[in-house]
Amino acid sequence: MPNYKRSALISTLSLPLGLLAEINFRRLARLPATIPGFEFPSLSIIIPARDEMHNLQVVLPSLAHIYYPGKLEILVVDDHSSDETAHIAESFGVQTLRLRHDIPPGWKGKPYACHRGALVAKGDWLLFTDADTVHTREGIAKAICYAQTTNLDGLSLFLEQQSSSWISSLVIDAAFAGLFAGWGTANAMLNGQFILVRREVYFDSGGFASVRNEALEDVALGNLMVQRGYLIPVMRGDDIAVVHMYATCKQMFNGLSRLGAGTLRWQGMWVSLTALHIAALISPLVTLIGVLFGRLRWPWLPVSWSMASLSLLPWSRRSGAAKLALLAPFGACVVLLASVYGLISRILGTGVLWKGRKV
């Protein structure tokens, strides 16, 4: 039988852990908005795409209208799509690389597609970005300018997230709150939605070929880069691009199963704070059960629920739906279920189905 009072007490941790998550997020430097005058290097934008015909019809027009004075090429890598991904890419006049042969043994699909794109690309800088990422007109130029003028080896950005439904918005907010509660000072994650790196750094480090069998190739690549001494900070790029992560609730659950279980591996001791924050956000549901069955006095419920809601409020505001913070326990519950499912699937070796593949 659950210890209802202990659960209610755990819920009081959601507020300080939520504050910690917000502090950690705000500590990420925001990419400067100015574009200084200098000679722009050549740039290759690489988009790995598997069954992305619909997303490409949004992202490619956004890239067609970006401001970039330097030499620019856009490369779509069609990763064995079953839809019209390659035809859509070609209709926009961008370079399209079709992967026709089976993925070599020891490789996962996305790192293979990214690496094949890098081998073909000609730019001095490589930008790996996803097909669900819509870019603002000057965003990429700002990123290049900052990385070049500050002598960085590259940079990665956390972007504005937009959801297709209030359910996915709620769940993604809870997932980010948990992630940043356990965001340690030595965190070496990169965000695969926007990874900008110098060409020579990519190939000297081995790039995605060095993390070829990783389901979370961006996180693994970030750790590799840090271990090898490269300077590739993660920054905030709220006004650089917008990401539409999941089209359906099923896709969201599978995506979080993949991300949740995989991210835990890379967070080290900080994962305890992530797990504790998710547990604290969920605990008002246990408190509710305790009140309904007469195990707790009713004042516990508004106290625990209010703390969880206030904890998620900054994330709900950023996603444009502040009222969803009132449903914080339900969002965190989905995050927990998805993460546990992903972890069990990984332990059993069955994997999580993602874009038609087990990862």
Regions found by a protein language model. Name each.
Residues 1-39, 172-174, 181, 335:
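N-terminal membrane-anchoring/stem segments of glycan-assembly enzymes
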Residues 61-71:
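Short, acidic, metal-binding catalytic loop of nucleotide-sugar glycosyltransferases
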Residues 35-37, 271-350:
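Membrane-embedded multi-pass helical conduit in multi-pass membrane proteins
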Residues 147-150, 154-178, 200-203, 208-270, ...:
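Catalytic donor/gating beta->alpha subdomain of glycosyltransferases that bind UDP-sugars
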Residues 41-44, 73:
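Cell-envelope/extracellular polymer assembly enzymes that use nucleotide-activated donors
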Residues 84, 131-146:
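Acidic donor-binding/catalytic loop of UDP-sugar-dependent glycosyltransferases
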Residues 21-27, 100-119, 142, 146-204, ...:
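Long helical/loop segments within the catalytic core of UDP-sugar-dependent glycosyltransferases
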Residues 78-87, 101, 133:
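A conserved acidic beta->alpha catalytic loop
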